[in-house]
Amino acid sequence: MFSNGLSKLIKSKIASTSIITTKNNYSISKLSFSSTSILLNKKYKLSEPFNYEQDCEYALKEPIQFWDEVASKYVHWNKRYEKVYSGDEYNPEWFKGGVLNACYNALDVHAKDPITKNRIAIIHETPSKNNTNKLTYGELWDEVCIFARGLHNLGVEKGDRVVIYMPMINQALIAMLACARLGATHSVVFGGFASPQLAQRIEHFKPKVVISANFGVEGHKINCYTPLLSKALELSSHKPNHTIVYNRLDVKLDAGEVLPPRVEGSLDWSELIKNIAPYRDYALVDSTHPLYILYTSGTTGMPKGVVRDTGGYSVALNYSIRNCYGMKSGDTFFAGSDVGWVVGHTLSVYGPLMVGLTSIIFEGKPTVPDASTYWKLIEKHRVNALFSAPTAIRAIHRDDADGKLASKCDLSSLRSIWLGGERLDSSTFNFLRNITNNKPILDNYWNTESGSPLITNPSCQVPIKANATGKPMPGYQFHVLSPTSERLGADKIGEVCIKLPVAPGFTNTLYLNPEGYKNAYLNEYPGYLRTADSGYYDENGYYHIISRVDDIINVSGHRLSTGSIEEILVKHPKIVECAVIGVHDELKGEIPFGLVVLKPQYKDCAEEVENELIKEVRENIGPVATFKKVLSVNRLPKTRSGKILRNILRKMYNKEEYTVPPTIEDMEVLKEIDIEFEKYKLSHPPKK
């Protein structure tokens, strides 16, 4: 990431600086740069308007000056940082000494400006219920400050922790921003998770307060949150001081739909904020203060708590929203994601609001009431950019194959469509190009850890190349490495890794598990952060992301651990052992497939056990797992040391080439499994 321009940035008062030179790259060890000691290289400055090549060169040659200029230009600091960068490449600290507030940067700067105060900030849409709810920046500011007062009255203050378990409604954003205003760290849990998953996060995070809603709307279905929350609170040994439930009045229930029961001892959101004054103060937090913790699937059953700092994240968002997505103040952005995921945090809440956009908050499914739902919303609100998982577009394509429904909608306001969360397939790409009259359709690679785009097509300035993910964002250097840490050349497949140190906004630790962070990301390849994604770059510098290299599978853009599913399966009293793999699915991209070995006395009741296992996974992880495929086999392929060959099983099912390791215990097992796979596929043909 850093280059030889660093030598120009250091004044004599900065001691103990070590610059290690390598071919075309420079590494840094234990250095720091004061914001007042930067010797500006007048050759470089932030491009205006944005120019991808120019900013790439600037960030490569003068990285400290580059990020200092971004931070100074776009972020409101109550106290300017003393050092742009300090620490070392394995533990970078950005904007040390800086003091700010994320809520102030997202709301106050707009609500206090007479030009933007009455601009629409968020639009909540529930199409299946024909429900729309808009809030201006001034109104959202009021709502957030009032709820912040309610939390403050309950004793929530800087450094406290709050869990938010809510559907995609305005109140979810209000809760997040109120926490940020008070300096409390929030952890949003995806509403599709079942009670055990929620309990696990409450247990680990130990929040002072849990905030939820009584129900959410998913397509034509009402999802009840309070029964799941009650069960989670029962399962968790940690008991929060308070539980707040927003009882919705914005949606009219249909005949047969019943309000869920209340959570025992919970506080009603509306009663909590009744007749109280807005909390206009805001907590000043350090740049490194954790804005939020977001749990993501780990390679074992315990999810990883990704820590997001306030200062670096604010800087990264301001830069990427403007210069990756090409958005400017007053534009409208529609991210078809959930606030329980990083895309929701970045592209529905903090990113759009910090830049002064209008953000569409979508509650529902893209094919309900019909496959024109997204396109009608784009026409209705004159949306300028759409972000979606390919899965959602595949579902739309399935229900509107020739694009007739889409053709009835005016998409002229749309400047670009961004796809992320999983690999973009050519069929989805071509469908979107056809229905949008060849508007830019752009892949978008990033992850929970980065918090913002890594490889993409910034502001549509890179020629679109079929099947390529794109090129790195300014400020990032990527290399493709072999298992022995050798840098691979063009068109050679390996693990895609990031040259250290990482840019602002990228997590540099896991909550309560710093050693786990090192083991997961830093120890495998010295000098690099591993992404656990395989891929390659071509002769023109385009990166191609292929698949995960670990046991994380990607279901409709949701990352799930196969290990967590295995833990549920193996608890069944009739199961000896099991393996869960990710298999291709036309609609969802990838879904889990379970192979189980039954105890001998239960061989005759395989179908019964398989149905029980599907039910268990649904109850313990939730419908998000899409676990519907189970196959009983006599034995599993293993190495002589007892390791199950999951990767080979996955490739066998998906009809991919594979290499049998010399350490395999019994080759005959693979033949047996292959026969069983073919039988299964014949008896379970894909749905049309």
UniProtKB/Swiss-Prot annotation:
GO terms for molecular function: acetate-CoA ligase activity; ATP binding; propionate-CoA ligase activity. It comes from Dictyostelium discoideum. This is Acyl-CoA synthetase short-chain family member B, mitochondrial. It catalyses: acetate + ATP + CoA = acetyl-CoA + AMP + diphosphate. The keyword Ligase applies. Belongs to the ATP-dependent AMP-binding enzyme family. It holds the Pfam family ACAS_N. It comes from the Eukaryota. Keywords: ATP-binding, Ligase, Mitochondrion, Nucleotide-binding, Transit peptide. Its EC number is 6.2.1.1.
